């Protein structure tokens, strides 16, 4: 499902911030704050969506390993810019690598131990 969602996006940048977990034996609940930026490609012109929200997670310990058992997504706010305000030629990022939501992302070359793309 995620690759289908990603098709119209040239930039996806999700930040996980505050993460609170409450344990109860072999079960746990978590609330995780997120900020997610997306630049969406459109025939009418690219636009940006910045979302602040939370994940409501449930976890279970199975055979000694903690795993997700469910997740709900909450959107607390959203900011849009139409047309897109992304400027990858701004002088402040001159000389920086530019990320991409696919195997052309610089992390594939720099982070060999992650073995990105391998299944």
Language-model features and meaning:
Residues 36, 54, 58, 67, ...:
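Intrinsic disorder/low-structure terminal segments
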Residues 43, 47-51, 72-119:
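Low-complexity, intrinsically disordered terminal/linker segments enriched in charged
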Residues 1-38:
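A solvent-exposed, acidic/Ser-Thr-rich amphipathic alpha-helical stretch
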Residues 42-46, 64-67:
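Short, solvent-exposed loop/turn segments that connect beta-strands within catalytic domains
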Residues 29-31, 52-84:
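Short beta-strand edge/turn micro-motifs at domain boundaries
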Residues 14-16, 50-55:
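Short, surface-exposed coil-to-beta transition loops
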């Amino acid at each position: 499902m995620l690759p289908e969602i990603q098709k119209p996006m040239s930039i996806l940048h999700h930040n996980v911030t505050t993460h609170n977990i409450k344990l109860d034996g072999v079960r746990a609940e978590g609330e995780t704050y997120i900020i997610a930026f997306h630049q969406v490609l459109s025939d009418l012109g690219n636009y940006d969506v910045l979302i602040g929200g939370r994940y409501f997670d449930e976890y279970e310990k199975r055979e000694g390993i903690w795993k997700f058992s469910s997740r709900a997504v909450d959107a607390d706010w959203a900011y849009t810019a139409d047309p897109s305000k992304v400027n990858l030629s701004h002088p402040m990022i001159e000389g920086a690598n530019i990320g991409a939501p696919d195997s052309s992302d610089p992390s594939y070359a720099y982070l060999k131990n992650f073995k990105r793309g391998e299944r």
